[in-house]
Amino acid sequence: MLKIKTVTVVGANGTMGTNVSAIFASFGDAKVYMVSRDLEKSKMAAQRAGKTVKADSIVNHLVPADYSMLAECVKESDLVFESAAENLDIKIDLHTRIGQSLKKGAVACTGSSGLSIQRLAECYPEEFRQQFYGVHMFNPPYQLPLCELTASPYSDMELYKELKEYLDQKLHRCVAESKDLPAFLGNRIGFYFINEALIYAERYQDNGGIDYIDSILGPFTGRTMPPITTADFVGLDVHKAIVDNIYENTNDYVHEKFVMPKYVQELIDKGMLGRKAKQGLYKMIKNDSGEKRMMVWDIKDGQFRDEIKYNFPFAIRMKQYLKDGDYDDAVRELINNRSQEADICLRFLLRYIIYSLWTAEHVGYDLRVADDVMATGFTWCPPFAMMEAFTRVCDLGKLMKERLRPEIVNAVDIDHILSLQIKSKYDYRIYFKAK
């Protein structure tokens, strides 16, 4: 296994950089140089990292630094992890600088959520390109152990195997190997679902829009957090960077589903980036008595309003079945209920299964990885587990052909997709929540 005693995290003042620094310092037991543009911000990030893991002892492993110290930090490090903004020009500049000081045998990696690993490897002198990899962790990494590992054509595959072992055994990551394709595997699947939910919110703005769609796709459908709430949590600017990258660099059968709706761009232009900016698609306010109220952006009116607690009959019945432990009847209710809301929900889940398996076949090296990325990176019911939930009560192929639109049925060989089904190691029942 790799012996990583000293790590440099570049962009350590950001949320991900701070959390990754804590992972290297705690699980990795490494000295970590936390580098950002401003030394004071690095110092504050080190304090936040200690609170993140609730272990003051790791603060002694964290060394705040700024870019003027970057070369010296890199020269000393066994591993350099770049966690800067998801902007290709910024990353090219940083990796060019890192490459000037990287020592022979050290690992260099990017935490990019989907930019080209080959392009970033080419920032390094030829003799160091073999030491560069994509190591995409999910945030927050203490709750989401997924790590997507990606090589480039230049990568030393023996070092790759050692890095995989280190991530797995030392940092306790669930390592998913991905091809060097836009957004890798997890975000390709997850942000297809999330962006389509944003599109549907605009389509159904007369019905309520954002909270209407989130209520249709809540925890009772196999996810911890509804999809539009997830976009708000991730950050609308981050969401935009991911879907724009996929749209510009892919051309699969759901290509247009990666076009971000105009209303989301308008929120970004106003600085309303989501939870980190205290407002975005949702906004929490306190009234004079100190009581908290959740507000939601009304797409039609262009202003915030009180969030509506929708009570769709199909959802009420599904939640009751789930509460009683009757998962089969919960799925039957979803299939047999012909309300608009149940139909939207069902078709989302069927499309999720199809696109997950299609993407795993094209982007991953092992179909099982589709389950790993969605379970450990998103805490969503993974596709093979969801297939099991459906196949227990229906002919899934027939259901897909009957309920999905012709553009999906005609674009994908559904029979082939279903032939890929394998037994999931994940239990679908733990993902469907009675709430």
Give names to the regions the model predicted.
Residues 1-435:
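N-terminal glycine-rich phosphate-binding loop for ADP-containing cofactors
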